[in-house]
């Protein structure tokens, strides 16, 4: 059995690393948190009362609105989010060292070899480091997601949860919304702005060719990680 040349072994290792990196990049760029499945709420069947005109149970309120208030009701969240962040960091470090050792003497006379003070020594060092970092990010989100009321708290607030999954030509787009809504903030058309959602968890991203083109490769991620020596 012939052995591989010494030069081909590093090339083979690099090729295997590239293939593994391609396999990793083929997965989801940014996985989403798994939401609990929305279980439909079955309303209890009211037992008819003999001899009564009105029966207990859910009915249509002629003088009320159709805002979400109970578990299982639907509510539309209008996404109006805009964030801007920037950060700048500069670091500069320098250090200099100098040490001189005088030549020893014997009976007041220096020890020399051929007229030179061979035992005289001096050392010096100079180290410096400079680093600079700049980050800027701006995000804007507009749209709407219809969510489901998952729980009604004792104070009347509603725990909501929902997501929207769009299957596009070049991939998938997913929007997830979770949070707590105050019943008084729900508009008459059964909508609420995302700025009124407490403990809001809004996730937006995608899977597919478009999302892959916006992600760094495995080698770039290595040089930007803590494992990079540079």
Curated annotation (Swiss-Prot):
One of its GO terms (biological process) is bacterial-type flagellum-dependent cell motility. The keyword Lipoprotein applies. The lineage of its organism: Bacteria, Pseudomonadati, Pseudomonadota, Gammaproteobacteria, Lysobacterales. Keywords: Bacterial flagellum, Cell outer membrane, Lipoprotein, Membrane, Palmitate, Signal. One of its GO terms (cellular component) is bacterial-type flagellum basal body, distal rod, L ring. Residues 1-15 form the signal peptide. The keyword Nuclease does not apply. Belongs to the FlgH family. Assembles around the rod to form the L-ring and probably protects the motor/basal body from shearing forces during rotation. This is Flagellar L-ring protein. It is found in: Cell outer membrane; Bacterial flagellum basal body. GO terms for molecular function: cytoskeletal motor activity. A lipid is attached at residue 16 (N-palmitoyl cysteine). A lipid is attached at residue 16 (S-diacylglycerol cysteine). The basal body constitutes a major portion of the flagellar organelle and consists of four rings (L,P,S, and M) mounted on a central rod. It is a lipid-anchor.
